[in-house]
Amino acid sequence: FGNWIEQGLTWIIEHFDEPLWNITIVILLGVGLFFTITTGLVQLRLFPASIREMWFGRAAEGNSLTPFQAFATGLASRVGVGNISGVATAIALGGEGAVFWMWITAFIGMSSAFAESTLAQVFKIQDKDGSFRGGPAYYITQGLKSRCLAVAFALSLIFTFGFAFNSVQANSIVEATKNAWNWQGEYVGLVLVVLTAAIIFGGVKRIATISSSVVPMMALFYLIMAVIILGMHIDMIPTVIANIYKSAFTFQSAAGGMFGALVSKAMMMGIKRGLFSNEAGMGSAPNAAAAAHVKHPVSQGLVQMLGVFVDTMIVCTCTAVIILLSDNYGSETLKSISLTQNALRYHVGEFGVHFLAFILLLFAYSSIIGNYAYAESNIRFIKNKPWFVWSFRLSVLFFVYFGSVKSGNVVWNFADTVMAVMAIINLVAIVLLSPIEIGRASCRERV
């Protein structure tokens, strides 16, 4: 059965991935620029306010989430394989310049993240137990009055986060643990299925509780190690940064498609992996943003905007510089997580390989939990029946195991294809609803 799924996914990837991404790049950057301009550079003007809101936001009432818990749930999905394995893949396939395009995607995308999470708060609904839920499927239905488009988005999110992204997370766990401890993928996959089942049958509130306590600790440990490594090579950092900028505008190797030489591999891989990592404008974080109880809708827009900054500008940059400071960058045999692990071996010895395997295991597992939370919200939007939710949970467990035993190329390409569909639908929706976000932002600044 797994082989049939793999063959079907391969056919879809071969026929739809390239044309979808040609469209996605234009819309992603265009919408980000639109909101950057119309909000008056919100990612710079209100950046200090986003930090205050995240730390001092209103406490939860009933079963709703605090702003910090919603931030951590969003970060649980953002901070993960994309920051470690995704960055390595981008550099291996697109060169140093891919890092620059990850930065651009994040900076422009911060305004899109602000807009989509503000909308999630405006159009959220309250359940009988007092908790809130919402996201693109809800603001498309209520704001654009289009149930069909909302269901299409919900399905794209379910396939992207519930299935594809969780396959990627599981695949990266297997690769990292195999490199470090020679663990077999089949057994790792079974353990992941059991651990995931134990959490996803416990409720979204438990997911938020785990995320808010574990994710910041993981990110802190990883950043401490990164700062130590950067300090050891501080004299080389200016050269690394200069090479990133220089390579970003080298168009010798085109990505292909209708843009031809206008889109380099650096740009294509930087944008793909940047979007995978920070999810800005994709329509995922609004599902966590809607669950928060805040005084003003814009407050959660600011919090989720901050998540994009932390994810890409800090965590992804640390990974990139660690790789580019090593002596194995450019090796044709090292890609994905193995490139990052070998870079750490160069800097701190075998400890780095084992440390990264452990950190990535926690990162990726927390991402699986966060991804599930997003997808479950959309499953309930389509059909809020116990048997439907349980069927979805079993499907999630299948794809966790699927990613554990299949090749990295298949699961990464699957993720690229479905997240392009999801991003296109959401970006079009938030532009059509832009008067609401812009109006709320203006109102928030007057109070």
Model-derived features: where do they sit?
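Select transmembrane alpha-helical segments in multipass membrane proteins
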Residues: I25-V31, T66-G74, S146-T160, V188-V191, ...
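Membrane-interface loop-to-helix entry segments
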Residues: I27-V31, F35-I51, N171-T177, Q184, ...
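Flexible loop linkers connecting adjacent transmembrane helices
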Residues: V42-P67, T89-I91, G95-V99, W103, ...
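Extracellular/periplasmic helix-exit of transmembrane alpha-helices
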Residues: F114-K124, M225-N243, F251, A255-M258, ...
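Helix-loop-helix module between adjacent transmembrane segments
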Residues: F34-T36, T105-G130, P136-I199, F358-I368, ...
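N-terminal alpha-helical transmembrane segments of multi-pass membrane transport
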Residues: F1-V81, I91-A98, G109, Y401, ...
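Alpha-helical membrane segments and immediately flanking helix-loop junctions
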Residues: E61-L93, L119-A137, T141, L155-I158, ...
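Transmembrane helix-loop junctions in multi-pass membrane proteins
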Residues: T38-Q43, G82-V87, E96, F163-V174, ...
